[in-house]
């Protein structure tokens, strides 16, 4: 019996790290390979990837990786995934022109040269094993965004990627509504649709409304202007450049990813900058304040981003000062609100004026609102619906919208990462869960991280560490030297000498008790020391630093 399996490995029940496995006749196409950024609780973690163990075991069955667009939550994990899969067989990668250019740049950074990268024109049909592949042009906050239509014997699996129905886009034509309708008439088996803004009524504003409001905001500013947005939001960068040109201001790009993406955008003709307008960050001070616009990364409060460093006066090239205006031309991704608010607060402390989308229409979402999601459902008329790209609340709301436009509730499947949807001629049903979850990137290391490791990092960052080194006799467990007490990062330790003496006294009492009870095993003695020290430190400080006893036998 012919069967199609759709297995989301990321992007359901969360915002970010989108990754979907579509399987048919024993062959696999992977749609998107995204990452997400760590929450504040993930201390020391740089990036979070989907757990792609399922793909590692099936590497030789993968026909291709197809990427809907060039945002990090859809493309960012590509180097790590390819490096892991390449040991068996390096799958080819397909996407639009800008998407492939960004993929190439990312792979070059990771020194991955032996990857087959294929640009696909909208409407072009390719054969990938038992699948046909077509990219359908969509509008989003980045050029060359596409929906992925995978044809199978049972019908088309349509993964929308991120989209909105923008009738007046700033770059290129509107979404290919006629092709979506044609696919609907031909037979869409399953629609996997973007749920990001399902909780917002009506239609999303067009990207083209942002430009005039940016120019209006710029005209009110007498000092320097810093605009922060996603580095991949090529359309927004163009509108900032246009607004700056209208007011005869120079533009400087700050942030490595901003410079890289703008360079790619200019090469492909998506960004046009007048000659002599761009200046380097070190040249900003050569011009009067009223003639400078800085376009910076950091709209999400990322710890190492350019704007965050400016806000904390830690940027080597740009020093913000009173009278500067910072325009947030982006809204926080769910989960980033705290980091963004902290950045804004630091900017106010410096004396900057801050403009956010709450103050003026300086941002338009790249994701369609509820009426656009209804339009997608009505255009493609899918047999089955599986909401994608959202937390569980948004997935539920998307399912309710599907029912509202006439799709039977039993044909709408609210899934989660790792839960495959199996479809054959008899119907659709969830299969047995597959391994899914998070893979952490910590510096150059990549792998799973146990909850205990993250808990230890949180404990160290919040309350510090005490290390107690004791030397005991191998024969009878007696103390052979005065205990050594070392502490780092322990807050509010005003009377350190007094506490250290108390710790030493308690340690000696514990060692004496262990020797008296003929306990000489070092691991048991360490446990006794840990319990006694942790209790003492909590009683004195009302905090729980990590306590690490070290027992040396002589």
Describe these PLM feature segments.
Residues 1-66, 71-286, 305-319, 338-342:
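His/Asp/Glu-rich metal-coordinating catalytic cores
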Residues 14, 142, 288, 460-462, ...:
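Solvent-exposed loop and beta-edge segments used for protein-protein assembly and interaction
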Residues 92-94, 386, 551:
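Short glycine-rich phosphate-binding loop at a beta-alpha junction
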Residues 107, 402, 537:
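Conserved hydrophobic residues forming the short capping helix/wall of the S-adenosyl-L-methionine
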Residues 121, 416, 543-547:
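Short Gly/Ser/Thr- and Asp/Glu-enriched loop/turn motifs at secondary-structure junctions
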Residues 130, 145-147, 463-467, 547-549:
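Broad gene-expression machinery/nucleic-acid interaction feature
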Residues 199-329, 333-358, 362-518, 526:
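Hard-cation-handling environments
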Residues 518-554:
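C-terminal tails and terminal domains of large nucleic-acid-associated
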């Amino acid at each position: 019996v012919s069967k199609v399996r759709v297995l989301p490995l990321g992007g359901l029940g969360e915002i970010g790290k989108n990754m979907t496995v579509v399987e048919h006749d024993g062959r696999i196409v992977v749609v998107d390979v995204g990452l997400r950024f760590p929450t504040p609780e993930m201390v020391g973690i740089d990036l979070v990837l989907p757990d792609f163990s399922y793909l590692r075991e099936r590497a030789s069955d993968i026909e291709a990786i197809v990427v809907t667009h060039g945002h990090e939550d859809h493309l960012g994990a590509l180097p790590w995934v390819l490096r892991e899969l390449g040991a068996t067989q390096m799958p080819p990668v397909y996407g639009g022109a800008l998407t492939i250019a960004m993929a190439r740049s990312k792979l070059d950074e990771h020194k991955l040269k032996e990857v087959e990268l294929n640009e696909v024109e909208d409407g072009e049909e390719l054969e990938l094993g038992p699948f046909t592949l077509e990219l359908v042009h969509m509008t989003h906050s980045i050029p060359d965004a596409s929906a992925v239509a995978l044809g199978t014997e049972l019908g088309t699996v349509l993964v929308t990627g991120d989209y909105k129905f923008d009738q007046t886009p700033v770059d290129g034509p509107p979404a290919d509504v006629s092709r979506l309708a044609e696919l609907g008439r031909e037979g869409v088996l399953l629609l996997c649709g973007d749920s990001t803004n399902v909780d917002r009524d009506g239609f999303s504003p067009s990207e083209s409304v942002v430009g005039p409001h940016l120019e209006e905001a710029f005209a009110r500013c007498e000092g320097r202007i810093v605009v922060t947005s996603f580095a991949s939001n090529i359309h927004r960068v163009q509108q900032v450049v246009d607004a700056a040109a209208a007011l005869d201001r120079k533009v400087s790009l700050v942030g490595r990813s901003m410079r890289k993406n703008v360079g790619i955008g200019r090469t492909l003709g998506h960004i046009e900058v007048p000659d002599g307008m761009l200046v380097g960050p070190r040249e900003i001070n050569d011009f009067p304040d009223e003639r400078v616009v800085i376009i910076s990364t950091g709209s999400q409060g990322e710890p190492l981003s350019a704007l965050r460093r400016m806000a904390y006066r830690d940027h080597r090239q740009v020093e913000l000062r009173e009278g500067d205006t910072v325009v947030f031309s982006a809204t926080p991704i769910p989960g980033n609100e705290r980091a963004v608010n902290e950045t804004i607060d630091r900017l106010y402390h410096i004396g900057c004026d801050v403009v956010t989308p709450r103050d003026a229409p300086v941002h338009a979402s790249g994701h369609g609102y509820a009426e656009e999601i209804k339009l997608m459902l009505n255009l493609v008329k899918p047999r089955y619906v599986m909401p994608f790209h959202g937390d569980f609340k948004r997935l539920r709301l998307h399912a309710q919208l599907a029912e509202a436009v006439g799709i039977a509730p039993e044909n709408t499947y609210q899934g989660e990462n790792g839960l495959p949807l199996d479809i054959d001629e008899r119907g659709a049903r969830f299969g047995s869960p597959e391994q899914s979850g998070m893979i952490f990137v910590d510096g150059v290391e990549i792998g799973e991280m146990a909850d205990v490791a993250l808990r230890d990092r949180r404990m160290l960052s919040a309350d510090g560490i005490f290390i107690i080194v004791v030397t005991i006799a191998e024969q009878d467990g007696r103390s052979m030297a005065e205990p050594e007490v070392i502490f780092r990062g322990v807050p509010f330790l005003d009377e350190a000498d007094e506490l250290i003496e108390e710790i030493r006294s308690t340690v000696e009492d514990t060692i004496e008790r262990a020797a008296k009870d003929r306990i000489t095993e070092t691991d048991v003695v360490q446990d006794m020391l840990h319990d006694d020290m942790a209790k003492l430190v909590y009683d004195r400080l009302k905090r729980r630093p990590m306590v690490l006893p070290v027992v040396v036998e002589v």
